[in-house]
Curated annotation (Swiss-Prot):
Its EC number is 7.1.1.9. The gene is mt:CoI. Disulfide bonds: none annotated. Mg(2+) binds at residues 367-368. It is a multi-pass membrane protein. The chain crosses the membrane at residues 16-36, 55-75, 101-117, 144-164, 182-202, 233-253, 267-287, 304-324, 337-357, 379-399, 415-435, 451-471. O2 binds at residue 243. Component of the cytochrome c oxidase, the last enzyme in the mitochondrial electron transport chain which drives oxidative phosphorylation. The respiratory chain contains 3 multisubunit complexes succinate dehydrogenase (complex II, CII), ubiquinol-cytochrome c oxidoreductase (cytochrome b-c1 complex, complex III, CIII) and cytochrome c oxidase (complex IV, CIV), that cooperate to transfer electrons derived from NADH and succinate to molecular oxygen, creating an electrochemical gradient over the inner membrane that drives transmembrane transport and the ATP synthase. It is found in: Mitochondrion inner membrane. There is a cross-link at residues 239-243 (1'-histidyl-3'-tyrosine (His-Tyr)). This is Cytochrome c oxidase subunit 1.
Amino acid sequence: MSRQWLFSTNHKDIGTLYFIFGVWSGMVGTSLSILIRAELSHPGMFIGNDQIYNVIVTAHAFIMIFFMVMPIMIGGFGNWLVPLMLGAPDMAFPRMNNMSFWMLPPSLTLLLSSSMVENGAGTGWTVYPPLSSGTAHAGASVDLAIFSLHLAGISSILGAVNFITTVINMRSSGITLDRLPLFVWSVVITAILLLLSLPVLAGAITMLLTDRNLNTSFFDPIGGGDPILYQHLFWFFGHPEVYILILPGFGMISHIITQESGKKETFGTLGMIYAMLTIGLLGFIVWAHHMFTVGMDVDTRAYFTSATMIIAVPTGIKIFSWLATLHGTQLTYSPALLWSLGFVFLFTVGGLTGVVLANSSIDIVLHDTYYVVAHFHYVLSMGAVFAIMAGFIHWYPLLTGMVMNPSWLKAQFSMMFIGVNLTFFPQHFLGLAGMPRRYSDFPDSYLTWNIISSLGSTISLFAVIFFLFIIWESMITQRTPSFPMQLSSSIEWYHTLPPAEHTYSELPLLSSNF
């Protein structure tokens, strides 16, 4: 047991560990979100303390980003699928792969500790000074959160190095870069973004750590520092981070839509690759659109507005290529395809509100209102999470060798779809009406939409529980697939379901007409 799970060097076992960890963290993060919506379901205090409320909001963000989406998408799907799609026997650095995983549980422990000692870190996930300074947040909470981020960051950087090396060096004969599966491309681009952005975050939070404990003044005006510097450093990481969260989802959706359409390949494969590369590149030069309210020059604001809008172009290319891939097929609405179609539609809606927020003059009004919350939850809660659900259902027979009940999955999709839209769509109206983020109380003019929003979150909670039940049911009944439904254009399906512990012991050769 300990050799298989504690000291594993097998990409499949490590990927499974990532999945288990991500699902567990996701349940913690979901519980926190239910607490937030319970507080906001009615005017007046429920938790009774704004500091505690902000600690819950901060922990919800950190857990969902660093311990749910990234471990499942990059660690879970990445580890499982990249070697199988490359025809590689394993990752390039199998032991480092194991270390990448085992840095995450200590990191999560540090984060949860930071919420439990002293007053907790009630800074929001951005951890802006002066609120996160030693004066406003005395005690160990913010320091523990910083150490947690350091560990999660090191884990991601090591994983990124591993994926890049694997894809460069371990492709089978015949898999040239232009024939690399789109999911593998998306993981490589994600890894490059991680490699370039995380060190900047590490620098920023290390400076914050020394400001708090070693009497430096990087972000303290009294000693000649500038809190705005922290914002620039943080968002230079933070904006690529949101593309890191969604890019592997793009890759998975491409595979699912292609295979469900019965097509040989995605429409415009090369265009899809260039679109992802462009999104990754542009993601690094738009960071200050998160800071339109800090008083930048008008020409700076004009630049960041236009640069942000340019990102909509490659994103649009991806959306329309997916629609073109679907074009002309007699669709069977399988659960994985339902999630993918939901992804395409809701991600587009989230992208449109993003274009609205890109206008610096409009953003002055909408900044730090629920409009922003609605925007990023549409792209994360209905982009990243829908992609995870689609991918998990699609590759579940490959991961486990079992099949889930498709009728239940469709019912569960309907529940979740209604739940998330009921939760986040009204938040656009709240934001336009000026309801600010990160406050636990609100005037009763906002009551109706908040009640509807909280009702939606309850529906989503039941949908998540239903999904766990569906997984449980599939595992106790042990239904096995008769044959893989997929086309031969995806080589991960050329195995027993689930694959043997060691696949590709003899390296495959891919012919030019696969």
